[in-house]
Swiss-Prot record:
Functional description taken from the UniProt entry: Component of the transcription coactivator SAGA complex. SAGA acts as a general cofactor required for essentially all RNA polymerase II transcription. At the promoters, SAGA is required for transcription pre-initiation complex (PIC) recruitment. It influences RNA polymerase II transcriptional activity through different activities such as TBP interaction (via core/TAF module) and promoter selectivity, interaction with transcription activators (via Tra1/SPT module), and chromatin modification through histone acetylation (via HAT module) and deubiquitination (via DUB module).
GO molecular function: protein heterodimerization activity; transcription coregulator activity
Keyword Glycosyltransferase applies: no
Region Disordered, annotated ranges: 92-131
Transmembrane regions listed in the UniProt entry: none
Name of the featured protein: SAGA complex subunit SPT3
Species this chain originates from: Saccharomyces cerevisiae (strain ATCC 204508 / S288c) (Baker's yeast)
Note: Present with 1710 molecules/cell in log phase SD medium.
Protein's gene: SPT3
Alphabetized UniProt keyword annotations: Activator, Cytoplasm, Nucleus, Phosphoprotein, Transcription, Transcription regulation
Modified sites of kind Phosphoserine: S270
Gene Ontology CC, one term: SAGA complex
Biased composition, class Basic and acidic residues, residue ranges: 113-128
Length: 337
């Protein structure tokens, strides 16, 4: 029987970037992969429903972003990711067109070409200057405030636009992650940092489109062919889901260790403290990247991931409605992380 878990290595790398040790157990990665697959299926089902409400059979990027519209920081990070992706694509297209334009020419008509070059040199320089100006596109969403009015303000082509509150919030989250990454990589050797850089490139979709489509069952869940950017958005969201689960599970494990330490202190307060001092000293020992497995440093276990999943699925009080007159059990669908 073929194993249904196909992303163990990628999940290990994502967990390592998020703060976990290099080799989590198979049960933990399998549970995370099942959770991520369930989230992807839920995203596809809800996006397909939104596309049908628009009267379309294919899923567009706006249908997926609409599901996470309340998380303004994540939406802004996703928009930045898509804009930089579009910028790289446009830069490659312009480089290719510039190469074709410079390589074409008729060698038999040398005099005429020389006259054209001499007369149009200034024009070519202007065209070349325009070629080099590649601006990062802005992803606009149809439910934003500006689309509620018939007339729109003129666009400002300057790059020094003021950031709104959502962009500042997204930048704060990004800076926190960069600070955490800087603290972890500060004392790394060259080989360790190369491994860290490789792990940061882990993805469910990059150069794995066929495997991802078979794994998620896109052809069975959607009628039409999804937009190309939808696969990239799903790759971005899967990375975010794994990082959120890992970071939350690490906080739960740390809180569990603190409670266990306090319990040991209270139990051994009247006894010899030799064993406790040895345990506490080994618990705070610095862990290197390529150290062998030890019994003292425990990896994330499935119970930590399950508790992290429960915490992340808790409905925020701001988005919870009163259910005083419904009675019975309160049914709710999974929350898109």
């Amino acid at each position: 029987m073929m194993d249904k878990h196909k992303y163990r290595v990628e999940i290990q790398q994502m967990m390592f970037v998020s703060g976990e040790i290099n080799d989590p157990p198979v049960e933990t990665t399998s549970l995370i992969e099942d959770i991520v697959r369930g989230q992807v299926i839920e995203i596809l089902l809800q996006s397909n429903k939104t596309a049908h409400l628009r009267g379309s059979r294919s899923i567009l990027p706006e249908d997926v972003i609409f599901l996470i519209r309340h998380d303004k920081a994540k939406v802004n990070r996703l928009r930045t990711y898509l804009s930089w992706k579009d910028l790289r694509k446009n830069a490659k297209d312009q480089d290719a067109s510039a190469g074709v334009a410079s390589g074409t020419g008729n060698p038999g008509a040398g005099g005429e070409d020389d006259l054209k070059k001499a007369g149009g040199g200034e024009k070519d320089e202007k065209d070349g200057g325009n070629m080099m100006k590649v601006k990062k596109s802005q992803i606009k969403l149809p439910w934003e405030l500006q689309f509620m009015f018939n007339e729109h303000p003129l666009e400002n082509n300057d790059d020094n636009d003021d950031m709104d509150e959502d962009e500042r919030e997204a930048n704060i989250v990004t800076l926190k992650r960069l600070k955490m990454a800087d603290d972890r990589t500060r004392n790394m050797t060259k080989e360790e940092y190369v491994h860290w850089s490789d792990c940061r490139q882990a993805s469910f979709t990059f150069r794995k489109n066929k495997r991802f489509k078979d794994w998620s069952g896109i052809s069975q869940l959607t009628e039409g062919k999804p937009h190309d950017d939808v696969i990239d958005i799903l790759g971005f969201l899967t990375f975010e889901i794994v990082c959120s689960l890992t970071e939350t599970a690490l906080k739960i494990k740390q809180r569990e260790q603190v409670l266990q330490t306090q319990k040991d202190k209270s139990q051994q307060s009247s006894q010899d403290n030799t064993n406790f001092e040895f345990a506490s000293s080994t618990l705070h020992r610095k862990k290197r990247l390529f150290d062998g497995p030890e019994n003292v440093i425990n990896p994330l276990k499935p119970r930590h991931i399950e508790e992290a999943w429960r915490v992340l699925q808790t409905i925020d009080m701001r988005h919870r409605a009163l259910t005083n007159f419904k009675g019975g059990r309160l049914s709710s669908k999974p929350i898109i992380m």
